[in-house]
Swiss-Prot record:
Stated family: Belongs to the protein kinase superfamily. Ser/Thr protein kinase family.
Residue positions binding ATP: I87, G88, K89, G90, G91, S92, G93, T94, V95, K109
UniProt keyword Transmembrane, yes or no: yes
Entry protein name: Putative receptor-like protein kinase At1g80870
Catalytic class of the enzyme: transferase
TM stretches of this protein: 20-40
Protein source organism: Arabidopsis thaliana
Length: 692
């Protein structure tokens, strides 16, 4: 019989095929799985280590051909960035001294913390300074861009910066008067080259001693173009001239007047508040027509409320608040009050009123305004209105609660020449007791309303600040002075919180504390703080020890404190004026000494203005120079600095005029210097639409 086939062989073959298929399936699945894991890991690492900077275009970075250095070359040249080779430190990076193989020295600036701001400054250096060649500017030799590393290579300046020579701790200054005057002239020529020698003009935006470097012959050169801008024709521009300062918005030119002595129709209410906040003891004109107090709330009858009211005799409520011991000011018969329009003119400036300074506080203004708006049927506000109507003459007269309670003698000394006013005086004495009984209840209701309004505003502002934070995370930042460009919503939040904390705002200057503890401090603080707090006129004991504030804030022009986002040539002129005073005096623009007798000299700009008023400007000259300086040149420099430090940009001289004045080819303009505090400028659209 034939043998039967073995049935185990097909089964074995089938099992092997099944096993092989299973192995291939599992292995391929594992390979795909690990490939996906590797891809995710690689993507996560790349996103984690990605540089949070703007895309960098090397080809378009600089119009000139700059040398491209490698990271290894710079590491060898600086001895692995050793601390012994550090020659300077700035806000965005550290500067090292490097040596090439052939023995040449150069300076290497390393950007420490990469961000949108530092990357923008890095590209500004390449685009602006890389395209400029001048003997008055530091030469940019090259750059390095590798991964997250950013380096700028400059020519080496052996005498370092002007700041180190002026403020060295050893006290041995090698800057005699000839060198100081030469440095001032060199900086002026550098600005002249940037403003008039470049097409389009270049605005530096950060003129200060640390950015003025000195070569082996003590010739000055300007460096650090991280905040500089190119002025482009056809873009958006601003006119920060003194139209608002003079109250002239129609375009007509009016002569500039000091803030303390306003003239009719020239000073607005906000400006008067700034003048009052700059000095406790100063008294500006209380005429309602001068200060444009169109929103003064007068209680009227129902028939005349909201309409134009012309009275023969109207008591002035403001004079009782400002000076209770004096006679009441009377409005002229031609004066017209429009409550509807006037209420809109207050704006945000009326919140600047300071408590404890003999002036109305913000709550008083609200009480006065609400007293004129709420119907007399409301018992809580019945006493506030106090409408006294004489049916015989038809004259409505409003009495003042605070003037009566605080100073009864002020009313007794007042002169009443009409029967209507005598009748008003009798009515006041009859209702005096009734008002005193309801006073506590009335103020309690007002405080409750006030707290509700504050709470509602804080809730609304928190929503605004949340939206602004999201925008900032999306890199919606301006690359200029960061502290000048807070958004409007953020400003309102900080302003409201600052009223209780007494913090610093670049838009409104210093705000005093409004709580009870701040009132105690006000009694001890006789010095006043005005709008000069955020410009070169800055004076504060708390800020005197802050290096960054000294380094930049004191050199900023006043118009940038008002929220200006665009640099102008006159801003460089203001910074140059502060620089002149620093070079001549050999001291910082803000320096509080230990002796309280020398506090008036702490603010260099204010002290210089005081000396100019007294006619002894040479007292400002550095004591280290003794008598080894030219008095005519020193006086010329100080007077030129005062001309550059004028609050209105259009009153400052051009840099070409500055150079001619320093050379003796031109005299300083006879325009009277303004020694009043500098109010914040506002931004107005320019017809030329120029963008800088």
């Amino acid at each position: 019989m034939p043998s039967r086939p073995n049935p185990t062989r097909p089964k074995l073959f089938h099992n092997r095929t099944k096993t092989l298929f299973l192995i291939l399936t599992i292995s391929s699945s594992l390979v795909i799985f690990f490939a996906i894991l590797y891809f995710i890991y690689h993507l996560w690492i790349s996103l984690l280590n990605r540089s949070r900077t703007i895309p960098f275009d090397v080809a378009a970075a600089s119009p000139l051909k700059l040398q491209l250095f490698t990271y290894k070359e710079l590491k060898l040249a600086t001895n692995d960035f050793d601390e012994s080779n550090v020659i300077g430190k700035g806000g965005s990076g550290t500067v090292f001294r490097g040596i090439t193989r052939d023995g040449k020295l150069f300076a290497v600036k390393r950007l420490d913390n990469l961000s949108i701001q530092t990357e923008t400054e890095f590209q500004n250096e390449l685009q602006i300074l890389g395209g400029l060649k001048s003997s008055f500017l530091v030469t940019l030799l090259g750059y390095c861009v590798e991964k997250n590393h950013r380096f700028l290579i400059y020519e080496y300046m052996p005498n370092k910066s002007l700041q180190e020579l002026l403020f060295n701790e050893d006290g041995d200054s090698c800057l005699n008067w000839e060198r100081r005057f030469g440095i001032i002239l060199d900086v002026a020529k550098a600005l002249e080259f940037m403003h008039f020698g470049c097409d389009p003009p270049v605005i530096h935006g950060d003129i200060k001693p640390s950015n003025v470097l000195l070569d082996s012959e003590f010739r000055a050169k300007i460096s650090d173009f991280g905040l500089s801008r190119v002025k482009v024709e056809g873009g958006y521009g601003v006119d920060l001239f003194s139209q608002e300062l003079s109250g002239n918005f129609g375009g007509e030119s009016t002569p500039q007047t000091a803030i303390g002595t306003p003239t009719h129709h020239e000073v607005d209410f906000a400006l008067a508040l700034q003048a009052s906040s700059s000095s406790k003891n100063s008294r500006t004109s209380r005429n309602i027509k001068e200060m444009s107090l169109n929103s003064m709330s007068l209680a009227m009858d129902g028939e005349t409320k909201g309409k134009e009211v012309s009275n023969d005799v109207v008591l002035s409520c403001e004079d009782h608040e400002f000076d209770q011991g004096k006679e009441m000011n009377l409005l002229s018969p031609n004066s017209v009050l429009d409550l509807g329009k006037g209420s809109k003119q207050w704006g945000r400036d009326w919140w600047w009123k300071q408590e404890g300074s003999g002036e109305l506080c913000s709550k008083d203004y609200v009480r006065e305004w609400i007293g004129s708006q709420i119907d007399t049927a409301n018992p809580d506000w019945d006493d506030d209105k106090k409408v006294i109507t004489t049916p015989e003459l038809g004259v409505s007269t409003r009495t003042i609660d605070k003037a009566e309670h605080r100073d009864e003698s002020g009313l007794n000394e007042s002169r009443f020449d009409t029967l209507e006013e005598k009748f008003a005086k009798e009515e006041i004495s009859e209702r005096k007791n009734k008002r005193s009984k309801n006073k506590k209840k009335k103020h309690r209701n007002m405080e409750e309303w006030w707290k509700e309004e504050e709470h509602q505003e804080e809730m609304n502002n928190k929503k605004k600040i949340g939206v602004l934070r999201i925008k900032f995370k999306n890199h919606l930042k301006f690359p200029h002075f960061r502290y000048c460009f807070r958004q409007k919503g953020e400003n309102s939040v900080h302003d409201r919180e600052g009223e209780a904390a007494g913090e610093f705002s670049f838009r409104r200057g210093w705000r005093r504390k409004s709580n009870s503890s701040s009132k105690k401090k006000k009694k001890n603080n006789n010095g006043s703080m005005g709008s000069e707090m955020w410009s070169g006129d800055l004076f504060s004991r708390e800020l005197s020890s802050t290096t960054s504030m000294r380094g930049t804030l004191c050199y900023i022009a006043p118009e940038y404190g008002g929220g200006c986002c665009y640099l102008m040539e006159k801003g460089d002129i203001y910074s140059f004026g502060v620089l002149i005073l620093v070079i001549v005096s050999g001291r910082r623009p803000l320096h509080v000494l230990a002796s309280p007798m020398k506090l008036e000299k702490a603010n260099l700009v204010s002290w210089c203005r005081q000396l100019a008023q007294s006619g002894n400007v040479l007292e400002l000259v550095d004591e280290k120079l003794k008598d080894g300086y030219n008095k005519e040149e020193a006086g010329l420099c100080i007077n030129l600095a005062l001309a550059c430090l004028q609050k209105a940009p259009e009153l400052r001289p051009d840099v070409s005029e500055v150079v001619r004045i320093l050379r003796g080819e031109m005299d300083i303009s006879s325009t009277a210097f303004e020694f009043s505090p500098s109010p914040p400028g506002k931004v107005y659209g320019s017809r030329s639409k120029r963008r800088s």
